[in-house]
Curated annotation (Swiss-Prot):
The protein's name: Xaa-Pro aminopeptidase 1
Positions annotated to bind a peptide: 77, 395, 489, 498, 523
Catalytic activity: Release of any N-terminal amino acid, including proline, that is linked to proline, even from a dipeptide or tripeptide
Primary gene name: Xpnpep1
CDD domains with a match to the protein in the record: APP
Binding site for Mn(2+) 1: 415, 426, 537
Complex formation: Homodimer.
Modification N6-acetyllysine, positions: 304
Pfam families, per the entry: Creatinase_N, Creatinase_N_2, Peptidase_M24, Peptidase_M24_C
Protein family (similarity comment): Belongs to the peptidase M24B family.
GO biological process, one term: proteolysis
Cell location: Cytoplasm, Cytosol
Record PANTHER family: XAA-PRO AMINOPEPTIDASE 1
């Protein structure tokens, strides 16, 4: 696939950086982050500014353009993809490698003295702004807000912002009403003497009001802001979508509710003016809560003396701890998902030897089987369907130019998931339809040992996710191997497939302790550039663990796998497993057989059931 030609776009952007219509004084550098005004990871087409300018469309990356340079920072998931998608105008900055400068240090090294660095304040997170501004200031430069987004000025066919209908969720799915959620939030606000809370993250707003949307592909969210006071609720949302009868009834808009639960509906774009007006009337002691990941524009609308920033909002933390209705829904969703994947893998085993299955047709088939399941809404992210060398591109998405045919000679990796009304799934399986090489089996077995080490871990209550990351890497490290991504991320309940504040990563940002009810992924991998990729991913639920003793009465936790899809034993060097690891695998496969087998039977999917039974035969080491 040829990289995007960007010379003319960069020329126009540099011209805009000097245009007095957009900037009071010329700027010498312009920063283009990945996100939108809500700092979302996955964004609508109208917000894909970095991809438009550079050609690189991965979910994480920051572009910086100066008069002479164009540089792109991204992480290890996207090194190969970014290198292929960008032309030679761009320098790829590989984050996490010791020779790669930070964005701030690079700017200081290339900018002329006293430079002005511009950025759209609605898109830049507050914590990023503070860090960048401090370094630039100490080097004699200035970070300046540019209120007109310069990319929008040169993007002549920029798509419209979506404004799609809303979906209401009942108590069967949510377990708790939106009024109760607001009441719980207000209790937390009162504990901290907070008068107002500004909600900017789209998944937090969707969760708070038990609403879902489809404004962002694969993410059931809708463009909005919310402000919650101790006696007031404001929802900033465009279109007439709250006027739909079901939504009106759900939000109780027609009822003469007591004032504290009456929702004022306001235009989406009025958030800054309304927030400034609200802050103008604050008494000296009143505080306004906002995430430090909210945009700089939103934070700056709140006077410093009244602003109370936090890394994780109370909604973010409450949303991460699933209640019993949400946990049960996630279990149901994963059983349905397993049925679809059993169908897929049975189909692949029959069709791949015939030579007509491609990465794209396999991904399409996975979606076809998922669509047959009850309450299917959408995929949860674009399917990563990759064979042979494409598997080494961690977040690869097949397109016609790169679409390989699955064969009996290559490792196949599929990372896929779905949004069902009762839950969100994310699962990766790696398989071989012929005979894997000894080296492929060796690497797969190291990854499996890491996967089991995390899944079977028992750890004290209060443990933070980053402390478990080395469990997943230990077998790889022993052989001098590793992978350049985190081991796990939080998963929403019919919400975003990636959510905070919990995760399992070598980066210590996974700083919220794991607690019962949180749902994360367990997904170690290994990638051999130009050859193959291996990843084994389950979604797991944090649950209390039964232990012989209970030190200091603190309790212990472990994981319950929600994903119930067989792990291909053909890829395993069984003799390299310990007895304990064999026991874990056999127990896991027995659960897959019992739980998913029952559902396959009830849906009359006999061939897939036979495949499941074959794939869950016990394994044993040769002693």
């Amino acid at each position: 696939m040829a990289p995007k030609v960007t010379s003319e776009l960069l020329r126009q952007l540099r011209q805009a950086m000097r245009n007095s219509e957009y900037v009071a004084e010329p700027i010498q550098a312009y920063i283009i982050p990945s996100g939108d005004a809500h700092q979302s990871e996955y964004i609508a087409p109208c917000d894909c500014r970095r991809a438009f300018v550079s050609g690189f469309d991965g979910s994480a990356g920051t572009a910086i353009i100066t008069e002479e340079h164009a540089a792109m920072w991204t992480d290890g998931r996207y090194f190969l993809q970014a290198a292929k998608q960008m032309d030679n105008n761009w320098t790829l900055m590989k984050m996490g490698l010791k020779d790669t400068p930070t964005q701030e240090d690079w700017l200081v090294s290339v900018l002329p003295e006293g430079s002005r660095v511009g950025v759209d304040p609605l898109i830049i997170p507050t914590d990023y702004w503070k860090k960048m501004a401090k370094v630039l200031r100490s080097a004699g430069h200035h970070l300046v807000p540019v209120k007109e987004n310069l990319v929008d000025k040169i993007w002549t066919d920029r798509p419209e912002r979506p404004c799609k209908p809303l979906l209401t969720l009942g108590l069967d799915y949510t377990g708790i009403s939106w009024k109760e959620k607001v009441a719980d939030l207000r209790l937390k606000m009162a504990e901290r003497s907070i008068a107002w809370f500004v909600v900017t993250a789209l998944d937090e707003i969707a969760w708070l009001f038990n609403l879902r949307g489809s404004d962002v592909e694969h993410n059931p969210v809708f463009f909005s802001y919310a402000i919650v006071g101790l006696e007031t609720i404001m929802l900033f949302i465009d279109g007439d979508r709250v006027d739909a009868p079901g939504v009106k009834q759900h939000l109780l808009l027609d009822l003469g509710l007591e004032a504290e639960y009456r929702i004022q509906v306001l235009p989406y774009k009025s958030i800054l003016s309304e927030l400034k007006a609200l802050c103008a009337d604050l008494s000296p002691r009143e505080k306004v809560w906002v995430s430090d990941k909210a945009s700089y524009a939103v934070s700056e609308a709140i006077p410093k003396d009244h602003r109370c920033c936090m890394p994780y909002t109370p909604i973010c933390i409450a949303k991460a701890v699933k209640n019993s209705a949400e946990s049960d829904g996630m279990r149901r969703a994963h059983i349905k998902d397993a049925v679809a994947l059993c169908e897929l893998f049975n189909w692949l085993e029959q069709e791949v030897p015939k030579g007509g299955v491609t990465e794209i047709s396999a991904a399409d088939k996975a979606e076809e089987f998922r669509r047959q399941q009850a309450d299917f809404v959408d995929l949860s992210f674009p399917t990563i369907s990759s064979t042979g060398p494409n598997g080494a591109i961690i977040h690869y998405a097949p397109v016609p130019e790169t679409n390989r045919t699955l064969s009996l000679d290559e490792v196949y990796l599929i990372d896929s998931g779905a949004q069902y009304k009762d839950g969100t799934t994310d699962v990766t399986r790696t398989m071989h339809f012929g005979t894997p090489t000894a080296y492929e089996k060796e690497c797969f077995t190291y990854v499996l040992k890491g996967h089991i080490a995390v899944s079977a871990a028992v750890f004290p209550t209060g443990t933070k996710g980053h402390l478990l990351d080395s469990f997943a890497r230990s077998a790889l490290w022993d052989s001098g191997l590793d992978y350049l991504h985190g081991t796990g991320h939080g998963v929403g309940s019919f919400l975003n497939v990636h959510e905070g504040p919990c995760g399992i990563s070598y980066k210590t940002f996974s700083d919220e302790p794991l607690e019962a009810g949180m749902i994360v992924t367990d997904e170690p991998g290994y990638y051999e550039d130009g050859a193959f990729g291996i990843r084994i991913e389950n979604v797991v639920l944090v649950v209390p663990a039964k232990t012989k003793y209970n030190f200091n009465n603190r309790g212990s936790l472990t994981f319950e796998p929600l994903t119930l899809v067989p792990i291909q034993t053909k890829m395993i060097d069984v003799n390299a497993l310990t007895d304990k690891e064999c026991d874990w695998l056999n127990s896991y496969h027995q659960t897959c057989r019992d739980v998913v087998g029952k559902e396959l039977q009830s849906q009359g999917r006999q061939e897939a059931l036979e495949w499941l039974i074959r794939e869950t035969e016990p394994v044993s080491r040769q002693h």
